[in-house]
């Protein structure tokens, strides 16, 4: 008889994001008291959790296969986990979802338009509230008095601080063409 063994790894960041001056806990803390409670629930319900994951994998594979063939479907199934992992989920002071991207391989910007934009199709397909959650921080920062430009911000800070902007507040950095950020915001904004 075969025996299956597994391992669960998790981390608890306690305070997840400093969102415009206020520390916010990760979204999962609204349901679970601590990381052990969350992991325990997932472990206890592992058969259901794995079945739901397999259903999602199958659904995504079939949709991608119909659109672009087997290689495209394989890439979509491979990349959607990376896309989700590149974001942090919290709520703001009004309880609205905030879904912030993290730049992992450059300077650590958070709420970065050019990281979030490529993931928008996935979230439009499965969870449109996350697209709104990507845009809320950008709209909030763009409405601040310190943002005096007529184009979209590149980001809303440096992880885990989402209360400023890495590039835009330094006028010396604003000599280039920043139409890319605005172009990246238009499609999800239209869907908003």
Feature locations, PLM:
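Second-shell loop/turn segments in exported
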Residues: 121
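Acidic/polar, glycine-enriched structural segments that form the non-catalytic walls/loops
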Residues: 1-111, 128, 132, 139-144
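Short runs of predominantly hydrophobic/aromatic residues within well-ordered alpha helices
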Residues: 72, 76-77, 115, 182-185
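Helix-terminus loop motifs that line ligand-binding clefts
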Residues: 130-192
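Solvent-exposed loop and edge beta-strand segments that line ligand/cofactor-binding
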Residues: 99-115, 166-181
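Short, glycine-/Ser/Thr-/acidic-enriched flexible segments
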Residues: 12-14, 125, 190-192
């Amino acid at each position: 008889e075969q025996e299956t063994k597994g391992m669960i790894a998790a981390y608890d960041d306690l305070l997840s994001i400093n969102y415009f001056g206020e520390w916010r806990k990760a979204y999962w803390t609204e349901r679970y008291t601590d990381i052990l409670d969350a992991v325990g629930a997932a472990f206890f319900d592992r058969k259901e959790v794995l079945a739901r994951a397999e259903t999602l994998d199958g659904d995504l594979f079939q949709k991608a296969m119909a659109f672009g063939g087997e290689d495209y479907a394989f890439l979509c199934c491979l990349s959607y986990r990376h896309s989700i992992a590149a974001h942090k989920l919290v709520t703001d002071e009004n309880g609205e979802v905030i879904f912030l991207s993290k730049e992992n391989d450059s300077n650590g910007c958070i709420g970065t338009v050019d990281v979030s934009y490529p993931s928008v199709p996935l979230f439009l397909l499965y969870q449109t509230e996350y697209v709104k959650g990507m845009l809320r921080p950008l709209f909030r920062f763009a409405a601040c008095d310190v943002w005096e430009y007529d184009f979209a911000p590149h980001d809303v800070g440096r992880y885990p601080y989402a209360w400023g902007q890495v590039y835009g507040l330094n006028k010396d950095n604003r000599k280039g063409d920043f139409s890319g950020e605005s172009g990246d915001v238009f499609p999800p904004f239209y869907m908003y």
